């Protein structure tokens, strides 16, 4: 479903000529959404080959997403194959992802498992919440690895000391 690579490259040039200042690219379309939001059975860095080809034909920055791994993204950015790594679902699993990368605490990162437990309900419910829908019993957007996802407004998750003191 969708267009082939050559048609996509031609469209990207049109968008650049029309004034777009960046392209956030993946292989997904409405009918093949799984390329834009790859589930667990899709390979890591699954959009990389096509997006690096896109980078060769346009002069504006190109961002790639799709189960991107930081080491692969870093190497591709260093080599000029793309300009940035697109990150979305990973922040649901671990909101401190970037901090842990910067501090090289790789073993502390809670990786997104691409389960779509929190991501796809966003579309079903036209937003997110921290409740169970009474009509169909579905939970509105809870990450399988991070139960705090979308519940920040309802619950106070701030860590508090057992004994407080005034300093």
Predicted regions and their residues:
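Flavin-dependent oxidoreductase catalytic cores
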Residues: 1-167
């Amino acid at each position: 479903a969708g267009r082939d690579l050559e048609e996509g490259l031609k469209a990207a040039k049109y968008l650049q000529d029309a004034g777009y200042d960046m392209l956030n690219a993946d292989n997904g379309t409405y009918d093949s959404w799984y390329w834009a939001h790859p589930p667990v059975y899709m390979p890591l860095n699954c959009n990389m080959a096509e997006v690096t080809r896109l980078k060769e034909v346009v002069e504006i920055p190109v961002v790639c997403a799709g189960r991107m791994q930081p080491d692969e993204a870093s190497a591709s950015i260093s080599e000029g194959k793309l300009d940035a790594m697109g990150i979305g679902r990973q922040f649901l699993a671990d909101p401190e992802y970037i901090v842990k990368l910067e501090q090289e605490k790789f073993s502390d990162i809670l990786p997104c498992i691409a389960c779509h437990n929190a991501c796809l309900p966003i579309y079903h419910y036209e937003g997110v919440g921290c409740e169970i829908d009474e009509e169909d019993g579905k939970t509105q957007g809870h990450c399988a690895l991070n139960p705090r996802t979308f519940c920040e407004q309802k619950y106070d998750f701030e860590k508090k000391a057992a004994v407080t003191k005034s300093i």
